[in-house]
Amino acid sequence: MRPLTAQTPKPLLTVGGTPLLEHHIVRLREAGVTQMVVNAAYLAEQITNFCGDGARWGVSISLSREPMPLETAGGIIEAMPLLGNAPFLVVNADIYTDFTYASLLRKDVMPACGHLVLVQNPEHNRAGDFSLIDNQVRPPGEYGEAGRGSLAGTLTFSGIAVYHPGFFA
């Protein structure tokens, strides 16, 4: 994303004049989420200043700051003290989506481990991240009826998921 991210963290890049992070905060609030944890690493001070406590959006935001970029799982583990004991929704703030977050907040979706939102493979990731076999996420090397060598059964992680805290224990 350089040069766009040379002085701006990806979550603060704008789409239609609005930062990506704000798009998510507003849509999450519209889905009924009022308590959020925002993870910040690269240029974290800008994200901290932008979010504040969340009051301007009618939500409560707690900030988790990574000492250095830890990738998705590392950032979640760092934020665990703020996330509590119930399943929680994770949205990568550097994506733009019209996904209906409320669909993941239903009790029948709350996982014992994790529930990943997968999408068709984009051109830049044709091999995908996972195979989906019998509604179970599997490593991309496993194939269902499509057979070995077929990419038909592979999908890409969207950056949206619901996790149970035990998944990271």
Enumerate the language-model features and the residues they cover.
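Short alpha-helical oligomerization interface
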Residues: A6-K10
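Conserved N-terminal catalytic core of the sugar/cofactor nucleotidyltransferase
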Residues: L13-T14, T18-N92, Y101-S103
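Conserved core of the sugar-phosphate nucleotidyltransferase
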Residues: A73, T97-A169
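A generic secondary-structure signal marking the coil-to-beta-strand transition
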Residues: P11, V59, A86-P87, G114, ...
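A phosphate-binding catalytic loop at a beta-strand-loop-alpha-helix junction
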Residues: M1-L4
